[in-house]
């Protein structure tokens, strides 16, 4: 695979290999055949980051080969959304002959949505001043004149200049209902929007008919908790990153959801609060004891759940676990399978043509 060529003819084979690999990894815990969710074969990534290489009068996007670390010029990137590809061409054309915008520019980050909005961040090794802002505004206006719905951001050390805003609003059809998700530049969002829809619909399907409330750790911008709110009486969710919490609060209002409560704290702190080990000012006015959480949802970082959180989730009759790293999922299952049984297993091909797999398991108490 090269950045400018996707081996689409190998899509089925690479997906089949992942299914076999996941089944083999899960064999100690379950004999289920994974439910398989396919990605679009191209234009599936909604975000991308590129270094910018200056070569005489020319400049262009590059990435580094993961093995050799050599530079690879990238003029088009079929893994990324069609909007990112349009913007890559337009940004280079707009910056190449503009000394103010190109000087010490070292990276461009793109974030796009299925609703055809974009935030583009230009990263610099220099101070950004009013002259930069004026030139950036002219570039933004020129891009919009090409019918590109784009917001530009300039970044340098301890500096962030938003020309308009640093977010875009995604609209996803999820099980017959449109969901609005605010996505903030430089915050985590699901990279493959088509796969995200399938993950949300699978999570809704496996929690159909759930009793009581839902607890979610690591909720981000509320991606899962807001979609799942329709299956539960109430949802209590934790998140540590301030921009993500603010986006989640916006998303609650935008989707007219009245049964979701977001708390800004780490999963480890929340465990202490639930166990009565510590009291937190942030929890004033929230009666944790009033929640009857029968289901816990976790979508942890690649490192998986720490041992304290493992113990905590075992207290819940139902565990829904989305994993971006099946190796740490299996490590967690060594503990969780002592008390819970795998009822559903899914493979989400979030990152086609790579070794990476995303998967989901539903566990119920034995």
Curated annotation (Swiss-Prot):
One of its GO terms (cellular component) is cytosol. Its EC number is 2.1.1.-, 2.1.1.35. It catalyses: uridine(54) in tRNA + S-adenosyl-L-methionine = 5-methyluridine(54) in tRNA + S-adenosyl-L-homocysteine + H(+); uridine(341) in tmRNA + S-adenosyl-L-methionine = 5-methyluridine(341) in tmRNA + S-adenosyl-L-homocysteine + H(+). GO terms for biological process: tRNA methylation. The keyword Transferase applies. Belongs to the class I-like SAM-binding methyltransferase superfamily. RNA M5U methyltransferase family. TrmA subfamily. This is tRNA/tmRNA (uracil-C(5))-methyltransferase. It comes from Shigella boydii serotype 18 (strain CDC 3083-94 / BS512). The lineage of its organism: Bacteria, Pseudomonadati, Pseudomonadota, Gammaproteobacteria, Enterobacterales.
